[in-house]
């Protein structure tokens, strides 16, 4: 079933501007409370100016441009501005450090980066090091440095025409984005996302939450994540709704923001729900317009009941991952919800539970959750420049192996059991154990290392490192945590460390992690 009808992202925005005109498309609120607002027509003009900016800097169809930004309107301008000229966005997690970010630039062969002043010192070093193809940086902010190879985004954009000056032929099969996601290997994989993927995500996610043009969808999710893009921004714009993007999450400010913007839909991860619940109760707790709260794993029944009772909202569970583009299994507004089920499979997809031999399992038996879609349309196209990884995850017939375990009941409701092997879920971020182990093992005093996830009341899982030191060495906690903080993003830094004389292993030498939790 083709619900996109050959419409690429350039056509989408031109149509939206014509249909909705002066209707509010985007509201952005910064951490300082500064609000910027754009209609559909004015947002399309900002997107066109940004597309022309990229063209003036030599970007053409198929070129890759990286964005390292916190939530801001410029992210939206760049995302769709690049798509309009057939270029490819490479969003970088705003919390990554230099080595991690440089690897993505190198792997995706990015020559142009858009970032903000706060991240510039890191990229100045990368630029001067000449270890990546990066040759130009476009900066957002005030008091910009007068360095070679650096330009001022706002000044350049303001000079551009609001009419698109470069319109190469586009297909819905063209790549719009390469989104690097943590995997079970030591390095992230680039998930290739097409124009069709994004257009489909808009229609699908709007259907999932019955979104209309009088809805207001508010999110605090980071724009560089798939959930912000494909379960919030794309459905909001596709339905002609108003999209409210907050720069950062604040438990103290959240409900005031919900009321201020009269949000009807929002999305939460467990960490948000837990921090909202520890805020002092107020008479205004139920005074809002929310009809749905999109929710992503993992929460106990007691936590769910306490949250819904206190705030008078319903949680709409959705299960997916970057590779599935959207929440391919989930609740639906009009359906009965069967907690702790993650819901039923959505339209355009099939789902099965399979055993270790890739055979379908009957209801009630636990196995791997496998999803069938169309690569490049309803699921990701491929892993960028990694054909072996693509073949390992994606069967020729379109079946995607998620690596997650679960089961389904007789009525077709699915239940999530466990996370991907070697992955830790920490406050909405996926952290690769192997990646951390490789970084920490570089410490000269450490002989052996393994990291595991342990239960955390707020952030789902905390990270604990078990280490074996070289003979005769000592290592303080301060020294260990300082090393980690200097070599990885903050959200990847372990919360705990324990020194051991050895690590439990099986007969093949593999560490038995269950003996360490």
From Swiss-Prot:
The keyword Ligase applies. The keyword Ligase applies. Keywords: Ligase. SUPFAM superfamilies: Acetyl-CoA synthetase-like (SSF56801). Transmembrane segments: none annotated. GO terms for biological process: carnitine metabolic process; fatty acid metabolic process. One of its GO terms (molecular function) is medium-chain fatty acid-CoA ligase activity. It catalyses: 4-(trimethylamino)butanoate + ATP + CoA = 4-(trimethylamino)butanoyl-CoA + AMP + diphosphate; crotonobetaine + ATP + CoA = crotonobetainyl-CoA + AMP + diphosphate; (R)-carnitine + ATP + CoA = (R)-carnitinyl-CoA + AMP + diphosphate. This is Crotonobetaine/carnitine--CoA ligase. It comes from Salmonella paratyphi C (strain RKS4594).
């Amino acid at each position: 079933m083709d619900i996109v009808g050959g419409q690429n992202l350039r056509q989408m925005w031109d149509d939206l501007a014509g249909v909705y005109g002066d209707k509010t498309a985007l509201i952005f609120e910064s951490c300082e409370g500064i609000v910027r607002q754009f209609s559909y027509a004015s947002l399309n003009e900002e997107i066109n100016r940004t597309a022309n900016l990229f063209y003036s800097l030599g970007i053409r169809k198929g070129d890759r441009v990286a964005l390292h930004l916190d939530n801001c309107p410029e992210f939206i301008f760049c995302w769709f501005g690049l798509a309009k000229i057939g270029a490819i966005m490479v969003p970088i997690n705003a919390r990554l450090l230099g080595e991690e970010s440089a690897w993505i630039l190198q792997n995706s062969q990015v020559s142009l980066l858009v970032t903000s002043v706060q991240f510039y010192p890191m990229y100045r070093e990368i630029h001067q090091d000449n270890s990546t193809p990066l040759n130009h940086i476009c900066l957002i902010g005030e008091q910009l440095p007068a360095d070679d190879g650096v330009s001022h985004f706002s000044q350049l954009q303001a000079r551009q025409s609001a009419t698109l000056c470069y319109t190469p032929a586009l297909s819905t099969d063209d790549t719009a984005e390469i989104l690097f996601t943590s995997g079970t290997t030591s390095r992230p994989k680039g998930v290739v996302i097409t124009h069709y993927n994004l257009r489909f995500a808009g229609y699908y996610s709007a259907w999932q939450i019955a979104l209309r043009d009088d809805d207001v969808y508010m999110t605090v999710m980071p724009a560089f994540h798939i959930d912000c893009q494909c379960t919030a921004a794309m459905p909001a714009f596709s339905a002609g709704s108003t999209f409210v993007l907050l720069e950062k999450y604040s438990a103290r400010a959240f409900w005031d923001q919900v009321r201020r913007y009269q949000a009807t839909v929002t999305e939460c991860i467990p960490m948000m729900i837990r921090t909202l619940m520890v805020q002092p109760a107020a008479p205004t707790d139920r005074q809002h317009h929310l009809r749905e709260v999109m929710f992503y794993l993992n929460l106990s029944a007691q936590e769910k009941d306490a949250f819904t009772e206190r705030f008078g909202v319903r949680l709409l569970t959705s299960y997916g991952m970057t590779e599935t583009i959207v929440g391919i299994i989930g609740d639906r507004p009009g359906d009965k919800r069967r907690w702790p089920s993650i819901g039923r499979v959505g339209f355009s997809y099939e789902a099965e539970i399979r055993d270790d031999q890739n055979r379908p399992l009957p209801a009630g038996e636990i196995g791997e959750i496998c999803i069938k879609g169309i690569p490049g349309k309803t699921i990701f196209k491929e892993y960028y420049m990694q054909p072996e990884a693509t073949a390992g995850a994606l069967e020729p017939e379109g079946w995607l192996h998620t690596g997650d375990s679960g089961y389904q009941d007789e009525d077709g409701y699915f239940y999530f059991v466990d996370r991907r092997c070697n992955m830790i879920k920490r406050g909405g971020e996926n952290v690769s154990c192997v990646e951390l182990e490789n970084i920490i093992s570089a410490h000269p005093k450490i002989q052996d290392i393994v990291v595991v996830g342990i239960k955390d009341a707020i952030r789902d899982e905390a990270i604990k490192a078990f280490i074996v030191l070289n003979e005769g060495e000592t290592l303080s906690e301060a020294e260990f945590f300082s090393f980690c903080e200097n070599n990885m993003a903050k959200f990847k830094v372990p919360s705990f460390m324990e020194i051991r004389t050895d690590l439990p292993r099986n007969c093949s030498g593999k560490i038995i992690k269950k003996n360490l939790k």
